[in-house]
Amino acid sequence: FGNIKDEERRKSELDMKALSLFKRIAVREKFGVEFLQRNGIDAVEVIDPTLLLESYRDLLPHKVEERNEILFLSLSDTAEMNAFAKGLSVKTGLPIRKHYGYLQPERKKNMEFLPIEEWLYAIASAKVVITDSFHATVFSMLFGKPFYVYISEPSKVFRISNLLDILGIKRRIVNDVDDAIAAPSINYETCLLY
C-alpha cells in the first residue's frame, strides 16, 4: 500500500477478489487495514520487518565514527527538499552529504549509490538525517539519530506518518527549517523501539 493514495486507483491495482480468497492478510499500515476492511476483507496491522531485528550494527563495515554532517537520503530529490536541507545546513553550520534511494535516469551521472552496509553506516555515522524514505527513517531511529522527514509528495506520508504517530514523534515530519529546529528531540529510551 505504501505510496498509493487514491482509493480507486488502489482498487484497480489490486485484485480484490483474489485478496478475499486469503484466510489471513497482514499489512504494515493502518490505512491499509482500513482500506481492506472497507472493501470487505479482514486484515491486521503488523510491524515492518526491518523492526524485527534487534541490532543492525553487525552489518556495519567498521566501527561507527560520527561525522559532523547532515546526511541527505532522498527518494524524490525535489527542489523543495534540497532548499530545506540547505536551510538546515545554514542554521546548524553542518555540511550536507547526499545519497539517493533509487536510480533516477535523468540524474544518474551525479548520484552515488551505496551498498546496503555502507548505506547503514552512512545513517549510523551521521549527526543528523534528512529523508523522505520510510526505511531511512526506521534506521535513523534504530541507530538513535536525530532525523527529519521531509515530505515533498503527500502520497509518501502514510506509512511514515503511521509509524511516527505510534511512537509519539510525528513532529519529526517537517517542511520548514524553523519547525525542524523547534521540534523536540527524540528520547530514544522511552521510544517504543527500545
Residue ranges and their predicted role:
Residues 1-194:
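Active-site anion-handling motifs in enzyme catalytic cores
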